[in-house]
């Protein structure tokens, strides 16, 4: 994998670049739609690629490990062949899922013992996996716990990289490994973590453990602390973030890659992100609004369907409503990061618009 930094914004830390992988080229900054179970929920891969214009998607190690399981994936020839997604794909570590299942997991030096949320069966995740396995502590964790958690994540990272360097490319394709910077909301722990991951000379670096309950301004501060230390010539991935405004603020602070379930999950529940602001399509005011969903949108659904029709589908809980909303929102996120390649003046105008509730 090769990352080329093509342009830096003179008025912020925003960057434009290009990521070359065995499965294709990704232009940054980029948003990666979340395909937890090797599918972006409710949307054909064709539409994710051609209508939303996604260049890379994300799949989830935890969920795919449990179902369909490693045996099926290996017999299929890997996640790409199993799912028929031909472009680049990022698989996360499962660390956040372990965090979210805190009631049924136990952390030890060897790894994380947990019970499946599907059938209660017992499992063990060790650091010898992609991405680097980490603990994701809550945003309000006491300092002592955050420091102890970070130390465990750092020891796990060392084991992870040792295994990674001994592993041949699977299915004939190179796999890149991104270390994950933790440290909760403590600037000195974040700085220590960023300095530690630099020693591995990785293909890219991830910033984890944010947007887990801490105030937004604290999240932005942690991004600034970390990106001041991470190498400029490698991509930076902010995990699980976030709203359109969060993404623009992340770009302004030097982040290159983002993922979040918000455009699909919130879309299924009636929240529509548009170039003029955010819509709750369930509200009665849209019942007889026959204007397009988003006149500035890039997906066919933005121009073919009206707000009134989407309101009707959402109220009736029709599957098509969730599909239209999800595709629109993903296309909006992708358009947002594409236009952000020409950044500062445009960003200020967009943040003002995105804060509106229509």
Task: Annotate each PLM feature.
Residues 24, 153-160, 197, 226, ...:
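Hydrophobic alpha-helical packing residues
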Residues 1-170, 284-287:
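Non-catalytic, usually N-terminal nucleic-acid engagement modules in DNA/RNA processing proteins
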Residues 129, 149, 153-156, 160, ...:
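Alpha-helical packing segments of well-folded alpha/beta enzyme cores
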Residues 69-76, 267-281, 334, 343-348:
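C-terminal helical cap(s) of enzyme catalytic domains, especially alpha/beta-barrels
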Residues 151, 163, 167, 172-293:
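Glycine-rich phosphate/ribose-binding loops and adjacent secondary-structure elements
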Residues 24, 57, 92, 179, ...:
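Conserved, mostly hydrophobic/aromatic
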Residues 158, 162-165, 228-231, 315, ...:
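Generic secondary-structure signature for well-ordered alpha-helical cores
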Residues 1-18, 26-32, 41-42, 136-142, ...:
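C-terminal extensions of enzymes
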